[in-house]
């Protein structure tokens, strides 16, 4: 397996590494989008849905604040096993500080 890249919490983790048998791993690569939002959507509408679930709500709209791009770059050998993994975090409120 070349890589196992998790995402769900939308909070990037710092546990990236190449495992013993050549699999690149990170628990959560993070979210791409506006971090001053509710998983990329306008905050007030998302909070209203949570607070008043029985009310009818319009579709959520994408937040338009400064975006952050999160991801990883994985270099692999010809045999498909990972050689390295490096997180990327560009723009927005989290960046490659300390990476």
Task: Please describe what each predicted stretch is.
Residues 1-62:
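Conserved beta-sheet core of the metallophosphoesterase superfamily
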Residues 45-99:
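A short C-terminal boundary segment appended to hydrolase-like catalytic domains
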């Amino acid at each position: 397996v070349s890589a196992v890249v998790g995402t769900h919490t939308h909070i990037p983790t710092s546990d990236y590494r190449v495992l013993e048998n050549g699999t690149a791993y990170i628990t959560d690569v993070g979210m791409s989008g506006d971090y001053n939002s509710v998983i990329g959507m306008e905050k007030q509408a998302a909070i209203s849905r949570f607070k008043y679930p029985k009310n009818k709500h319009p579709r959520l709209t994408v937040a338009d604040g400064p975006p952050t791009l999160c991801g990883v770059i994985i270099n692999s050998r010809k045999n498909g096993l990972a050689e390295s993994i490096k997180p990327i975090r560009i723009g927005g409120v989290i960046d490659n500080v300390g990476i």
